[in-house]
Amino acid sequence: MHHLLEQSADMATALLAGEKLRELILPGAQDDKAGALAALLLQLKLELPFDRVVTIGTVLVPILLVTLVFTKNFAEEPIYCYTPHNFTRDQALYARGYCWTELRDALPGVDASLWPSLFEHKFLPYALLAFAAIMYVPALGWEFLASTRLTSELNFLLQEIDNCYHRAAEGRAPKIEKQIQSKGPGITEREKREIIENAEKEKSPEQNLFEKYLERRGRSNFLAKLYLARHVLILLLSAVPISYLCTYYATQKQNEFTCALGASPDGAAGAGPAVRVSCKLPSVQLQRIIAGVDIVLLCVMNLIILVNLIHLFIFRKSNFIFDKLHKVGIKTRRQWRRSQFCDINILAMFCNENRDHIKSLNRLDFITNESDLMYDNVVRQLLAALAQSNHDATPTVRDSGVQTVDPSANPAEPDGAAEPPVVKRPRKKMKWIPTSNPLPQPFKEPLAIMRVENSKAEKPKPARRKTATDTLIAPLLDRSAHHYKGGGGDPGPGPAPAPAPPPAPDKKHARHFSLDVHPYILGTKKAKAEAVPAALPASRSQEGGFLSQAEDCGLGLAPAPIKDAPLPEKEIPYPTEPARAGLPSGGPFHVRSPPAAPAVAPLTPASLGKAEPLTILSRNATHPLLHINTLYEAREEEDGGPRLPQDVGDLIAIPAPQQILIATFDEPRTVVSTVEF
């Protein structure tokens, strides 16, 4: 009974998911929410962005420049005339109006009919306005000749592109799915491909009609001719303003002239004497600048038009219709791709500009991006996943009982040592939550691992490994600690005390000389006691680098006593012999005086050549390579083991020259003869 209830719930969930997905991929009421209001607001764009740029550059910008010139002429006087001081106000106004009308430079000694005219300065603003109107003629002709036909073509084409997707989603995909299900679970991929190919061959009458329409538009070139004629006409008409403005910029540079008042226009001799008045045109410089800007702007627009036409009819490879329609079963001819001069290419550009009118555009983009899968295959897989509602393919979490090993467990430990911690995810079912978003919400499993980690016991602090550096420095630190605590007495010869245990790793004053940190224990079990590794073997030079307490006692070296404490022996001042150079300088030391120092034999040539046994410590200042540990190394080799000298005073005596074996690390030994002077 429980199994039947669970299966019915799974079936209901599958049906609900299928309904939501059908609303997403199939046309429904959500596509027509705006209705007629959206149709009124959305109007077809009959100009491409490139066409709008050309119109702005050739029409609107020159009009703005003309407006600037007219504004300057109305804001101030277009001409300044410097009349004599005896002229009345009316005479001055008459002289200014007469000179603005004539605009002829009365050169002395030149016939009046040959006087140069400055009328181009006065005519330039009107010429710019006329050129702007002329450059708008191609756009106006395109609007009248192609707008009606282009509007009807775009309406039909955009609607059919939208319907192609709907027909494929509603008709072909369910039919393919039904045929695949009829084959049973043993169907192969080859049989599936054959079913899909056969379904593609079976086309509806609407699809056949749309393919015929595309074929007819591919053989027609009416819109292509109109589009090409529009831009070629712009190139031809722009030659007129460019030539005129270049001539004006090159010839009209004069802004001052002499106006002859009272002279007859035809230069008759019967006229009275003329009064010459100097005049100036203040807007000449501004007009020259505007003419130069207009020339550059028109040249740039012509270059842009040429590049766009070459790209459109020669080098363009992408096509909005070709990229979209072949994904929904509409066949296109390759000859349309080779021949760019046809209406289908012009319509493709305008379809891309009006793509907001295609309601299923997002779905078409999804199909186009999935280039490795056919659209029918994608829809078939979606519907097949929703149609299966058996026990193994329900939208419940069937694999929720799979055990997952805790990532915090230590992988180095053997499996038999302890039972590995296991995280068991609870079994839960996915519940559909209806929202305004048609997309299904992703199922999020609870983070069980995070809960287990939060419930773990506090992890123990890591234990630091003891390195060779700590082994060498620990005796020195222990002796220094005893010295500063007040234990400065003479320890006397005796056995070396046992080394102090290393400080606890959690003490704050512990000095760490190594960066090697033990990794944290990432398990839930108790931390095991970590065995301290043995000290690394050091070389002979490192073993003698620091003296232990037993060696200090044997050599007669003791820490300096505390203040006011009686010295056990007489303190010997620093002598001049080089034997003191071999004492270590690790801390303050005092040397005990021996009972009787033996006599030193004088140096003779016979004694220089003789090699005596090594019984006394001697270090020559001229050989800095000698160290105090060299003595012990040589004596250990001769006697077979380490031993201390019988008399401490022998350390201070100056021995006779002898042969000393020097052993530095593992290098070959060298015989050195020392000579005392």
Swiss-Prot record:
GO cellular component: a single term: Golgi membrane
Region (Disordered): 393-423, 454-510
Name this protein carries in UniProt: Pannexin-2
Membrane topology per record: Multi-pass membrane protein
Role description: Ion channel with a slight anion preference. Also able to release ATP. Plays a role in regulating neurogenesis and apoptosis in keratinocytes.
Impact reported for residue 89 to W: Reduced currents. No effect on membrane location. Loss of ion selectivity
Entries under InterPro entries matching the protein: Innexin, Pannexin
Catalytic activity: ATP(in) = ATP(out); chloride(in) = chloride(out); iodide(out) = iodide(in); Na(+)(in) = Na(+)(out)
Source organism phylogeny: Eukaryota, Metazoa, Chordata, Craniata, Vertebrata
Main location: membrane
Superkingdom assignment: Eukaryota
Extracellular side: 71-123, 250-292
Resulting phenotype, residue 89 to A/E: Increases ATP permeation. Reduced currents. No effect on membrane location. No effect on ion selectivity
PANTHER family for the chain: PANNEXIN, PANNEXIN-2
